[in-house]
Every structure is written in C-alpha cells, then in structure tokens.
Amino acid sequence: MNNKNLFKEMFFTLIPLILTNSLGILKYITNAFLVGNFLGGKAISVLSNTFPITLIFYAISIAFSTSISVLISKTFYNTENENNIINSKKIANNGYMFALITGIIVSFIIFIFDNLFLDILNTPNEILYDSRIFLLLFAVSFTPNFLQKNINESLRVLNKPNIPLIFVGINVILNNLLLYVLILNDFGIISIAIANIFSDILILLASYVYIRSHEVLKIDFSLFKIDRKIFKDISNIGLPIVFEQIIVSLIIFFETSISNLGGIICNSAFGIVGRWEEIFFVFSQSIQSLMIIYICRYYFTKDKTMIFRITINGIILSILPIVLFISIAFIFTDFACKIFLKNEDIISIAVKYFHIAGIAYCIMPIDMIFNGFIIGSAKTKFLFITNIIASISEIIIVVLLYKILNYDNMLALGCGIITYTLFTLLLNYIYYLKNVFTICKIEK
C-alpha cells in the first residue's frame, strides 16, 4: 500500500472514531451544562470530586477492553493460521466473561470503600453525602458500561468503526433526555448516575442484538468458558495499562486534593477546566485508537516497516485537534469556562488555571500517538514505568512550588500537569525510536 492510500484509509477510519468520541464529548458538555446551570457550583464540585474515583474504575474497563481487542486483532489478521476465526471467537467470548467477572468485583469494591475514597480526597462536608450516593449509583452502571466498551473496541479493530458510532449516538440522546427529565423532577446531582444506568443497559441490549449475527463477536455458549491462557494474555496486556491508569487516577486524586485546599471556589474552577481536559483527552484518544488499530494490523503481520509511515500520518492527522485545543485554551478561554457556570469568581480562577494547564493539553495528541504504538504492539509494561517517572516528577514540582516556594495552589497544579505530560511524551518517544530502529534492522 502506498502512502497516499494509507493516509486516505487512516483518514476515513479516524472520522468515525472522532465522531464517536465527539458524541461522548457532547454527553460530558451537556451533562455539565445541565448540572451547572440547573443545580449550581455545588453540583459541579460533586462531579469534580468523584471524577478521580470513577476514572480509576473506568480505566480498568478501558484497559481490558483494549487488551481484548488487541488480542482479537492479532489473531484475526494472522491469516497464516487456518484457525484464526475460531481462535478470535474464543478470545471474544472469554472477553465477555472477563468483563462480567471484573465488573462485579469493581462494583463490590465501590460499595465497600466509597467513604474511604472520599476521605482520601478531602471531600468537603457540604458535598460528602451527594458524592457518596453518586458513587454508589455509578457502581451499578459499571458492568454494562464495561461490556459495551468491550464490544465497541472489538468492532473497531475488526474494521467496523461505524457501528460503535451509532451505539454511542443513541446512548448520548437517551442519556441527556433522561438527565433533563430527572433534573426537572428534582432528583438533583444523582440524575447523572441514574441516567447513565438506564442508557448503558439499553445500549448494551441493542449491542447484543447486533453481535448475534457477527462472525467473531457473537456469543457462543460452547466457547463461553474460562480459558486460562486467554485470561493470562488479557491480563499480560491489560494489567500494565490498568496500573498505568491507576497511577494517572492517583495523580488526579492528588490534584483534586490540592485544589480542595483553596475551598469550593478553587475546586469548582478545577472542575470546569477538568471538563475540558476530559474533552481534549477523548479527542486525543481518537488518535490513539487509530494508532492501535493500524499498529495491531501491521506489527503482527511482519509488515513492520509500515509503522514509521503510520506514525507520520498520525502526526499529520493530529494537527487539526491541536489547533482546536490551542483556540479553546488560549483564545476563547473565557467563553469556554462560562459554558458551565456564570460565577465570576470561579471563572476568573478557571481561566488563569486553563492558560497554564492548556499547554499540556495541546501536547496530548502527539503523546497519544506514541501511546498507541506501545499498546498496539503489546509492549504495555513500559507505560507503567513511564507513568511512575512522570507522576513522581509532577508531585515534586507541585510540592516544590506550593509548599516550599508558596506559589498559588492552582499555579502549582498547572505547572505539575505540564511536567507530567512532557515526561511521558519524551520517554514514550525515546521508546518508540528504539523499537522502530530495531524493527527496521530486523527487516533489512
């Protein structure tokens, strides 16, 4: 395949990925808009306080869904193996079992340790009760959400990126309609959690109907049993991603705790910028997903010299998101923050913080390209090492600026986030170069 055709193929694969994630962004924006405008700053604070906790558990579902899809892709595209279809089906069905078992365990952990998690975050007493109820309801929606992610990621690597787009679109519409109705009926902040439960379950049922006719992903009860080797392979790829994401979540715990030191005003400002951080992350994740799809396809089919061309095309395709991030973080910052809340004191702090942390957000798409290479080539252990180094660096910078040099807590946080992103980008890039040169040497 020449580079022109490769770029065209990657471009048309990226479009449904971006559209899918854009619909997810729309869900975040409308959720925060409805909560902020109908329920106020206190409700936004509940979202920002529970976000680090929900992120940890969502990270588990993302990590294992990704590892399952990598294994399916690796097996399915290995046409030298005449049993590639049946082996892919075995992995898919074991993936469903893995998601179901893990989902139940995660829900149980949240039910038992919810108070401990909120104590670690220094959650203000004014929002403690609402935060706890929100977490308990989140636990109920986790398993169907995990199963749905599993199906979506597998469809993407099997060259069906449009189907997850449809599922996510319907989910967003259902979620926001339910949320609006629940808020109008005085359900308060728990409206988001309740809307998530019902919309996730309904979409999972729709997904089940679709995969019943799919060659690889349909549920086959003769294969619906634990295969220790497949579970081990899922764990070998997924666990380093889980640990990496747990480190990221713990850092967000740390960041949230620091923002809480400035009271609800600082925490609400942190929450507003946090909504945009989620949006930027989801856009960047589209680039990462694209890299995973193509690296999986070519890394395991011995056509490894394509990797460099895939990476260059990924960088070109990331230019538009970067320009968009720069516009929001540095040009239309005031407008972007006021979408969620009208309180001038909170907006003032949010804008200043956004101008600092925004530097890191603009680098994020490039960092995700190299992340995608590492995950797609199943070299996930390095992600764990990278994040340990970057996280320690961020903590050192924040403590140095806030505790020792007495800088403003939000300024310290922004500088810490920049430090973290620069370290992950540098280390991932070095690792990428090392592997590409090794691959090229082997090919010669």
Segments (PLM) and residue ranges:
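Transmembrane helix-bundle signature of multi-pass secondary active exporters and lipid flippases
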Residues: 15-70, 138-145, 232-300, 318-325, ...
